[in-house]
A protein has these predicted regions:
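Generic N-terminal leader/processing signal
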Residues: 1-2, 281
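Generic start-of-chain signal for non-secretory N-termini
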Residues: 2, 19-20
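Hydrophobic h-region of N-terminal signal peptides that target proteins for export
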Residues: 10-18
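Sec-dependent signal peptide recognition
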Residues: 2-10
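Subset of outer-membrane beta-barrel
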Residues: 20-343
Length: 343
């Protein structure tokens, strides 16, 4: 039974790695459940517009404008795998604004069998996290934020837990640019009876910039992710296909300059939002690193692309996104946010 659970655990971790190009027991902490964030590449958004969807990944976006707002998200990820999120924000005049987030990842149920293959029951596998974020506007140009989170894992009777913090800062320039710097998942594992190892958390430092164009209803965004980890190059099937000599069959190493450019490109994500009137927003992004890691040779795919839209109806905003994470994974994201002050 233990071997079977460990095998399933390895499969689930592979799903997490496919989704976010990171390994480890706690890779789900890098997975977004927000439709807006997913449509724009899955990274902390460098915008400050009181959208509670942004609070989980970027606590510097938490402010007084989020007071008494709520968000509900659902992700149809892959086969029986689905995620759900509940968010709420409140402002306390003396100590700042807070946002609470509960995320739940369900990986479905599996048959429990004896060594002879007889089904004796079933068991579930799931992850969850509880996040409390704080944010404050220091000046008209500066915002800061921090969050503490507990991450838990339950696979059959095996479990693990970790504690982490996020810190973030945001600067709004007088020229219209907004810059954001985030350090996520700084922490440690508390316990682990799955494999008795001390697994690291998926620490990352991400930089983002955005600007709303002056004469067009467009906001452009650019990210450089995983600043702490330069080398993202790997021997993907596409890379091998492109760099194998057709005559000798030998793999030819890419030049140093080409390696540098490709490596830098693997860190870049570009995206944008187009506002149509007062109630409709279109969103899209492209993640070259995701495409480089998960694309397949000689296939025309949309791996690395994501898109979505939002519709505002009175006190509600309904957001939908679809993200092409690999040739077999295109998760669907749905988020409903509401301003309880308007009820």
């Amino acid at each position: 039974m233990r071997k079977r659970v460990i095998t399933i655990l390895a499969l689930l971790l592979a799903v997490g790695a496919t989704a976010q190009q990171t390994n480890g027991t706690y890779s789900f902490l890098r997975t977004t459940n927000s439709a807006r964030v997913a449509a724009l590449g899955g990274l902390p958004l460098p915008v400050y517009d009181n959208d509670i969807q942004l609070a989980t990944f970027n606590p510097a976006t938490i402010g007084e404008g989020m007071n008494n707002k709520m968000g509900l998200s659902y992700v149809d990820y892959y086969t029986d795998i689905n995620f759900a999120t509940l968010q709420y924000a409140h402002t306390f005049n003396s100590i700042g604004s807070y946002a609470a987030t509960v995320q739940y990842h369900n990986y479905g149920h599996f048959d429990e069998t004896s060594e002879s293959g007889v089904v004796t029951g079933d068991f579930g596998c799931s992850d969850f996290s509880v996040n409390i974020g704080w944010g404050r506007q220091l000046t008209p140009n500066w915002n800061i934020g921090a969050a503490v989170k507990y991450a838990g894992i339950q696979y059959e009777s095996y479990s693990a837990g970790a504690l982490a913090v996020d810190v973030a800062g945001m600067y709004h320039s007088n020229s219209g640019w907004t810059f954001s710097l985030n350090a996520r998942n700084i922490g440690t594992q508390l316990f682990n009876n799955i494999n008795s190892s001390r697994d690291p958390l998926p620490f990352s430092i991400d930089f983002g910039a955005s600007r709303k164009l002056e004469h067009l209803p467009v906001t452009v965004m650019l990210w450089y992710d995983d600043i702490q980890h330069w080398n993202k190059l790997m021997m993907t099937p596409t890379y091998i296909e492109q760099h194998t000599n057709p005559i000798t069959g030998q793999l030819e190493e890419e030049g140093k300059v080409a390696q540098f450019i490709r490596n830098a490109a693997c860190h870049l994500v570009i995206g944008g939002e187009l506002t149509l009137g007062k109630n409709i927003v279109l969103r899209s992004a492209f993640d070259y690193g995701q495409r480089y890691a998960m694309d397949v040779p000689k296939e025309r795919t949309l791996v690395g692309f994501s898109a979505g839209l939002a519709v505002k109806i009175k006190m509600f905003e309904i957001s939908y996104a679809r993200s092409r994470r690999s040739v077999v994974m295109s998760p669907n994201y749905l988020t409903i946010t509401m301003d309880l002050n308007k009820f």
